[in-house]
């Protein structure tokens, strides 16, 4: 699990009062995986998609007012002559909680979230593909999230805890 400390305002846009809340998801894991790959000489990019998560908690759905999760992040690594997608998303605790198999990554095939859980219920559905980026498109992501999740950002901007909403 990637844990980040809360800081006062992000250094990129200065408008996010608690940057760690916003980045405590799959996107920072993708940024970290991409940076780690690059640090050992593996060409890597960031990829983003909107997804529909059919196994979300009701608290989170109420907070976001939708089941569409925008800007789901993943890494794209250049291995053995081709680009391979890798989703660094759920830890084993989340997989167990929602009855999904942990994602495997063999370095040859794309590793995306499973479409169905272990009970054959819909789990993850990929909707919009934003493409690949050399760097995190932070301003674009924040602008998009603020317009799509006003209730969430109202809590964040008022320094309210959202910890129990997940």
Please annotate each region the language model reported.
Residues 6-7, 21-22, 42, 92, ...:
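Weak global preference for isoleucine
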Residues 51-166:
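His-Asp-centered catalytic microenvironments across diverse enzyme cores
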Residues 17-24, 62-64:
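Conserved, aromatic- and glycine-enriched, well-ordered alpha/beta core segments
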Residues 22-48, 75:
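Cysteine-centered nucleophilic/redox motifs
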Residues 16-17, 45-50, 57-58:
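N-terminal start-of-chain detector that recognizes signal peptides
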Residues 10-16, 36, 78, 95:
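Generic recognition of cysteine residues
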Residues 1-21:
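Secondary-structure boundary elements
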């Amino acid at each position: 699990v990637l844990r980040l400390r809360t800081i006062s305002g992000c250094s990129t846009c200065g408008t996010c009062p608690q940057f760690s809340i916003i980045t405590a998801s799959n996107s920072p894991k993708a940024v970290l995986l991409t940076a780690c790959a690059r640090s050992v000489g593996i060409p890597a990019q960031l990829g983003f998609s909107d997804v529909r998560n059919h196994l979300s908690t009701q608290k989170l759905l109420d907070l976001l007012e939708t089941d569409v999760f925008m800007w789901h992040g993943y890494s794209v690594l250049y291995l053995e002559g081709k680009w391979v997608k890798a989703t660094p998303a759920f830890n084993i605790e989340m997989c167990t909680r929602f009855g999904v198999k942990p994602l495997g990554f063999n370095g040859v095939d794309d590793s995306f979230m499973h479409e169905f859980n272990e009970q054959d219920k819909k789990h993850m559905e990929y909707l919009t593909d934003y493409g690949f980026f050399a760097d995190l498109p932070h301003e674009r992501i924040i602008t998009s999230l603020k317009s799509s999740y006003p209730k969430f950002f109202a809590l964040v901007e008022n320094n309210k805890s959202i910890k129990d909403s997940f």
